């Protein structure tokens, strides 16, 4: 059987209501509370359904019987009645109440009776007053809006609540106001400007001076905004703008701070409201956060985020958003605030991109820049969130119409460049692609093209603070703009013929190349790629018919030259090809200098070290150039073309490039010339290419007598000091234009030696000396700047001795070439095998190349100037990136870089610089340098800046080399036998010395050392990873050890004329002809450096034949004597190998002294510091565990040692007096410093609390005097202090003010109307007040109205108000008549007496005057 629970609940309620009526009728007050609670629960369960009561009965019972109990004197009955009625209003509909018969009578009681009682309850601070007001207003509902009498009665109650000084009453008044807003919104009254202005009055004017009141006020105001909904834009000026100013400051009154700056609770509520107003798109996390905070949700997207509304009101919205960003970033944000920061920045970004309001975009970028430049470095979070949003969503920016687009692009560009240090490069690049998208910046007409040109000029403006990273981002913008320019010029080609546009675009094309060349040595990566080169080529081709094209091509040639010399650019060949292509289209022979520019640039390319790929591309461009030219053009340029082709072949051979490209290249050029009718140029070209296979064999027997040369020949000889020794007959005319190569008259080659002398052009390992008559003129200008220094001769010698010494040194150069070259090739093959398995990284990793070491310098004792003999050693280079040696270009004198050898070769410490003949004084030059620092520096720089091997041989004319140096790379590993055809006496001595030296060197461990080095690219980011393997010169290690090893010169026999040379050499045990070898040293610590290195020993090198022997002595620079046991404190850090272990060793020693001093000082000051810590930590309640030095920890990246103090001194000091403690504190720290420390680390409340705990009265007096003095000088401070006192102690503050001032002073500051109303109201309930007021009426009549008519009218008004009876009227008339008679009698008597006295006695006049003066 189904049970109807609703009917049962209704019947239960009926029973309870009938019982309640009986209790109320019987007046059993002790049961009222239980009865009302039971009634409320029954009403809730039944919903007042199926109760068998009519609607009228229910309304009459609840509003007639229960509602009056809310005003009962018993507070408990009040509370129960309020709760029960609130439950009944849920079940009882308002329409039912208003349709009841008894409603008009109940409504009259509400207005006339209950409002007065509610006011009394409010004055009595009864918290139920606002609950009852709320219930009555909800019951009144729509009737409240129909008559102004009703609403005014209820509004007066709340208005006085807003003015109440008690914060609780004011907060309750705001709760009442929320109910009123709800009723207005329910009946669509908020659309009325009058109604809205009424609701905003307390919100805009009432002050919120407490956290509780401000929170409730903010909630009520936000509820009003949520009720406005889509009407929000119409009421922005009156409602929204004031709300933003109320929360975050600013606004029409330009408030410095808002509610969110003062109260944490208000901040938690204000920031979500701000984000909701900025809602460009709906956000579920924001909705969830609003529900958690019990805030009403605003419709999403926000009604304010439309283009029309935003254009009008973006300024106050942006000001509020910036203030909110600062609040969210100034402290460590909670999880909710981090979410709000992300949402606020995202909405800002969406508004910038979608709404396309140009002034807002510019202002927003400017404000974000200001936040980014803040001192607290909190702006990084904002810009990271901004660019993350752009990059993650690939936002598309709506184009701003008109000229404002230029301002927007400029603002974005500044923001991007300012943010590069905070935002990762990848994110910033994607953001640039979105912001400067081609379809958003491209030009569709001349005005837009002009605007785009203006932005291009802005982009090219140089900034002093700009670095290479900023240029990289600018270059990305350059690409976007270039694409837009290309698209426009493709459809409007005539624009390029306008002079201004052509000049701008020419500058635009040169800018990236010029800027990149200016950053040489400071850039860590290459910025150009294939897409850039394609764009650049398109723009170059677009301006083919532009005016001033020749000037542009000339400037482009100079720019390409600077770029080539500044740093190795992998894609230089692409740029060069575009330049040559443009030059061909313009006309290579129209202007004479143009083809010379091309060939001059090619000569520069061949002279500069470059990769094989770049060289092949440039040679291919040269071939294409030749193929494109016609016969008449080739005839014009042929004289300049020949040396260029020769230089290209020499460069190819010098770099020892592999592959068949060169042969194919030759065939292509020859095919072009073979097709021409004129065969003269083809024949010359054939001879030129055949000259490449010319090999010259120079015998070791070679004589020169400088004394037979004329002065002119000596000058020419000096000028050609760097040309290889290919000339026998030096007595021939040196003034002729050409020098004929020499061929020996007779060369006897034994059959056993034919293998050594068979040299072919196809041998890749051979060194080719290619000197022809046509190449001589090309080489000479390059070599002319090499200056050979003039050195002092140690003594006069005969010509024979000079020749013997020169021959002996030439022989010493060839000690160990065979085995060393074999090891070099082996090392190269191993490196090539390592580099081969990585083909995927071909654009980044280059193939192994060879690098020449520091040139080895030979010297002779000839009277003429010296020539250098360079013996190149193959070097294997492992390229790590496309940018090699980024630091070298900026250094005037490059030093050998640290090397790292990956393959497991036994480690050997060996440093062998070349032999340089000098005087017997310590050398001040670098190892491997000649007397000319500029030339040597240039040679070293050329060797280290580019991974290429120079194949040029430079021979000394006075010191002829043998055949081993002609082709030493393919020499056999066996010991060479003396050649039989050398018959001179000097040559026989050389052969004898060579045999003996080779016998001695075959057993030496240094003979098999390889001269190859692995020059590794060391970038700053990877320097610490490989810091353990560093090459350190031995002389620098000697400085580290702090020891002194002096050496004495070798005493040569007096019978021998010996040359003694002195030079600092790290390891003289290696071959003198070999450059500095690789060494590997692991520095464990400073004390582990051994002192028995071979570099610290002397070596005597001499040949066994006395006439040609030379004694050499190697002296280290003298240092002051130090003890090896004492650690060296003053180290030159630039001479110390900066390994991780070395830094740790230095840090440990420095830290050791500091720790010892700190411990010694701490032991003396333990008690003082313990007491100080106890006094400082007393407010936090923590025990003093550390002394003052614990906070001053040693600033070290390693293990920091905290010096802790034992607890015994702390306990001992706790019993000392306060005076003693204060004295010890002053001994530890200066009072000023202590005060600064307290101000910096302690809040003001803690310091003041200490003073008040010690002496409350004295501290309070001093604080009051200080505030009083400050208030006199600062009006704002005075206002704040007085407001605080009046808010927290309103009654006492007012009582004291009244007591301290006269009543007249107090009354002068009151409104007379208010005082009069108060006195009249008081007289109604106080008899004494009423009597006093009536007693003042006669005086007012005397001194008030001047005319009798006014007085009479006032008296008549009084009589009418009194409504006297007949008897009272008669008595009043009798009194008036009697008063009239008395007045007439007194007047006549006074007049008669006066007249008689005046006539009878003349002296009465003086007496009367005296009486009058006394009265006065």
From Swiss-Prot:
Main location: nucleus
Disulfide partners: none
Disruption phenotype: Embryos have a reduced hatch rate and develop into adults with reduced survival. During mid-blastula transition in embryos, S phase 14 is significantly shorter. In larval salivary glands, loss of DNA underreplication resulting in abnormally enlarged chromocenters. RNAi-mediated knockdown results in lethality. Escaper flies only live for a few days and are infertile. Females show increased necrotic spots in the abdominal segments. RNAi-mediated knockdown in the imaginal disks does not affect viability.
Annotated Polar residues bias: 1029-1050
Extent of Low complexity compositional bias: 928-945
GO CC field: chromocenter; chromosome, telomeric region; chromosome, telomeric repeat region; heterochromatin; nuclear replication fork; nucleus
Keywords of the record: Cell cycle, Chromosome, Nucleus, Telomere
Compartments it resides in: Nucleus; Chromosome; Chromosome, Telomere
Top-level taxon of the source organism: Eukaryota
Keyword Cytoplasm: no
Biological process, per Gene Ontology: embryonic development via the syncytial blastoderm; negative regulation of DNA-templated DNA replication; negative regulation of mitotic cell cycle phase transition; regulation of DNA-templated DNA replication initiation; replication fork arrest involved in DNA replication termination; telomere maintenance
One Pfam family matching this protein: Rif1_N
UniProt region (Disordered), positions on chain: 789-858, 886-984, 1021-1054, 1166-1186
Effect of residue 1067 to A: Probable loss of Cdk1-mediated regulation leads to lack of dissociation from chromatin and block of replication resulting in anaphase chromosome bridging during mid-blastula transition in embryos; in the eye imaginal disk, results in complete lethality with pupae developing into headless nearly adult flies
InterPro entries membership: ARM-type_fold, Rif1_N
Modification after translation, per record: Phosphorylated, probably by Cdk1; phosphorylation regulates dissociation from heterochromatin.
Effect of residue 946 to A: Probable loss of Cdk1-mediated regulation leads to lack of dissociation from chromatin and block of replication resulting in anaphase chromosome bridging during mid-blastula transition in embryos; in the eye imaginal disk, results in complete lethality with pupae developing into headless nearly adult flies
Expressing tissues: Expressed in nurse cells and follicle cells in the adult female (at protein level). Detected in adult at extremely low levels.
Stated role: Regulates the timing of initiation of DNA replication. Functions in copy number control by promoting the underreplication of DNA, which is found in many late replicating euchromatic regions of salivary gland polytene chromosomes. Promotes underreplication by localizing to active DNA replication forks in a partially SuUR-dependent manner, and inhibiting replication fork progression. Might also work as an adapter to recruit Pp1-87B to multiple sites on the chromosome and may function with Pp1-87B to mediate underreplication.
Family under the similarity heading: Belongs to the RIF1 family. Highly divergent.
Quaternary structure annotation from Swiss-Prot or TrEMBL: Interacts with Pp1-87b. Interacts with SuUR (via SNF2-like region).
Name of the protein this chain belongs to: Telomere-associated protein RIF1
